[in-house]
Amino acid sequence: MEDVTLHIVERPYSGYPDASSEGPEPTPGEARATEEPSGTGSDELIKSDQVNGVLVLSLLDKIIGAVDQIQLTQAQLEERQAEMEGAVQSIQGELSKLGKAHATTSNTVSKLLEKVRKVSVNVKTVRGSLERQAGQIKKLEVNEAELLRRRNFKVMIYQDEVKLPAKLSVSKSLKESEALPEKEGDELGEGERPEEDAAAIELSSDEAVEVEEVIEESRAERIKRSGLRRVDDFKKAFSKEKMEKTKVRTRENLEKTRLKTKENLEKTRHTLEKRMNKLGTRLVPVERREKLKTSRDKLRKSFTPDHVVYARSKTAVYKVPPFTFHVKKIREGEVEVLKATEMVEVGPDDDEVGAERGAETDLLRGSSPDVHTLLEITEESDAVLVDKSDSD
């Protein structure tokens, strides 16, 4: 709006003397002289009044236009303020949703931590039981070594089948043959019985002595044979081959149990790693992890003032509705050299060694394998120990 200078000339009223004029009052002669040119002065005053009115009208028009513009800008500002209020309300709603999601995630994380604690407690108990079993196995090995060194076994041998000599069987056959004619004699008449009875008594008395002698001889031979058999059985039981076989069996059983426990621990470790990776990806996505990594690197650099500064050019976008600003940031520094990664072949032996070391480190660090698998391991080890004791 342009600055306009407004000059207003006031018209003096007739009959009042001009206050600004100084000096004595005019004489009647001078008054007459001044009254003559009054017509020309009045015309000039009328023209100046018209000019002043036109200027006032133009100024009023400009003021009205400026007021209209101010009203329009005020209406636009009100619309923008309403839009900003809507955006703020939407942001508040999103923030409330984010707070609810954060609360739910915190609850899930707390539950997961409780489960992990329970699993760690169960793992500690199972580990204690496994250590006890290992101690018992060591004690058994020590006892076995001492027994092998002393050779103080007490072996009970039971013989079910007892072979009788041939003479005793002959005497039994003779007794049976004697019993048969006695039964036939009962069927015969009374007159014939006394003679046959006498003959039978004579035969039985002669053969009884022979049977007693045969029985005594057979008992002595049987005792000798049983003693010889027992000695042979003891020799076989305490032979070096038998002891070596028992040692080999015990070692094989122990190796089998160790291999089974290692395999089960590796399986549980793999399953737990998969579950933890799945939970980690659910809780923290990959993009979030990368952002956290970059923020950690930035914090580390900020705490180390002597770090190397690399040159970079970055474009950032800032959105302030209804405008979008593209800002390009250029930083001077050294050229960053990317390190090339080398691929190394890994053999099967290296994989096995790495798996064994990983399992050992997981056990030392207190990794939490599955409880059911560990209980199955303990049951299998108990079954192997029972089989070993039965075989011994």
UniProtKB/Swiss-Prot annotation:
<keyword id="KW-0175">Coiled coil</keyword>
<dbReference type="GO" id="GO:0006363">
    <property type="term" value="P:termination of RNA polymerase I transcription"/>
</dbReference>
<keyword id="KW-0472">Membrane</keyword>
<feature type="region of interest" description="Nuclear localization signal">
    <location>
        <begin position="138"/>
        <end position="154"/>
    </location>
</feature>
<feature type="compositionally biased region" description="Basic and acidic residues">
    <location>
        <begin position="173"/>
        <end position="183"/>
    </location>
</feature>
<keyword id="KW-0496">Mitochondrion</keyword>
<dbReference type="GO" id="GO:0005634">
    <property type="term" value="C:nucleus"/>
</dbReference>
<keyword id="KW-0007">Acetylation</keyword>
<feature type="region of interest" description="Disordered">
    <location>
        <begin position="173"/>
        <end position="198"/>
    </location>
</feature>
<keyword id="KW-0492">Microsome</keyword>
<keyword id="KW-0832">Ubl conjugation</keyword>
<dbReference type="GO" id="GO:0042134">
    <property type="term" value="F:rRNA primary transcript binding"/>
</dbReference>
<feature type="region of interest" description="Required for homotrimerization and for interaction with CAVIN2 and CAVIN3">
    <location>
        <begin position="1"/>
        <end position="100"/>
    </location>
</feature>
<feature type="region of interest" description="Leucine-zipper 3">
    <location>
        <begin position="259"/>
        <end position="299"/>
    </location>
</feature>
<dbReference type="GO" id="GO:0032991">
    <property type="term" value="C:protein-containing complex"/>
</dbReference>
<feature type="modified residue" description="Phosphoserine">
    <location>
        <position position="120"/>
    </location>
</feature>
<dbReference type="GO" id="GO:0006361">
    <property type="term" value="P:transcription initiation at RNA polymerase I promoter"/>
</dbReference>
<feature type="modified residue" description="Phosphoserine">
    <location>
        <position position="391"/>
    </location>
</feature>
<feature type="compositionally biased region" description="Basic and acidic residues">
    <location>
        <begin position="1"/>
        <end position="10"/>
    </location>
</feature>
<feature type="cross-link" description="Glycyl lysine isopeptide (Lys-Gly) (interchain with G-Cter in SUMO2)">
    <location>
        <position position="118"/>
    </location>
</feature>
<keyword id="KW-1017">Isopeptide bond</keyword>
<feature type="region of interest" description="Disordered">
    <location>
        <begin position="1"/>
        <end position="45"/>
    </location>
</feature>
<keyword id="KW-0804">Transcription</keyword>
<feature type="cross-link" description="Glycyl lysine isopeptide (Lys-Gly) (interchain with G-Cter in SUMO2)">
    <location>
        <position position="124"/>
    </location>
</feature>
<dbReference type="GO" id="GO:0005739">
    <property type="term" value="C:mitochondrion"/>
</dbReference>
<comment type="similarity">
    <text>Belongs to the CAVIN family.</text>
</comment>
<feature type="modified residue" description="Phosphotyrosine">
    <location>
        <position position="310"/>
    </location>
</feature>
<comment type="function">
    <text>Plays an important role in caveolae formation and organization. Essential for the formation of caveolae in all tissues. Core component of the CAVIN complex which is essential for recruitment of the complex to the caveolae in presence of calveolin-1 (CAV1). Essential for normal oligomerization of CAV1. Promotes ribosomal transcriptional activity in response to metabolic challenges in the adipocytes and plays an important role in the formation of the ribosomal transcriptional loop.</text>
</comment>
<dbReference type="GO" id="GO:0005737">
    <property type="term" value="C:cytoplasm"/>
</dbReference>
<dbReference type="InterPro" id="IPR026752">
    <property type="entry name" value="Cavin_fam"/>
</dbReference>
<feature type="coiled-coil region">
    <location>
        <begin position="201"/>
        <end position="284"/>
    </location>
</feature>
<protein>
    <recommendedName>
        <fullName>Caveolae-associated protein 1</fullName>
    </recommendedName>
</protein>
<feature type="modified residue" description="Phosphoserine">
    <location>
        <position position="169"/>
    </location>
</feature>
<feature type="modified residue" description="Phosphoserine">
    <location>
        <position position="173"/>
    </location>
</feature>
<keyword id="KW-0805">Transcription regulation</keyword>
<dbReference type="GO" id="GO:0005783">
    <property type="term" value="C:endoplasmic reticulum"/>
</dbReference>
<dbReference type="GO" id="GO:0005901">
    <property type="term" value="C:caveola"/>
</dbReference>
<dbReference type="GO" id="GO:0005829">
    <property type="term" value="C:cytosol"/>
</dbReference>
<feature type="modified residue" description="Phosphotyrosine">
    <location>
        <position position="158"/>
    </location>
</feature>
<keyword id="KW-0539">Nucleus</keyword>
<feature type="modified residue" description="Phosphoserine">
    <location>
        <position position="302"/>
    </location>
</feature>
<feature type="modified residue" description="Phosphoserine">
    <location>
        <position position="204"/>
    </location>
</feature>
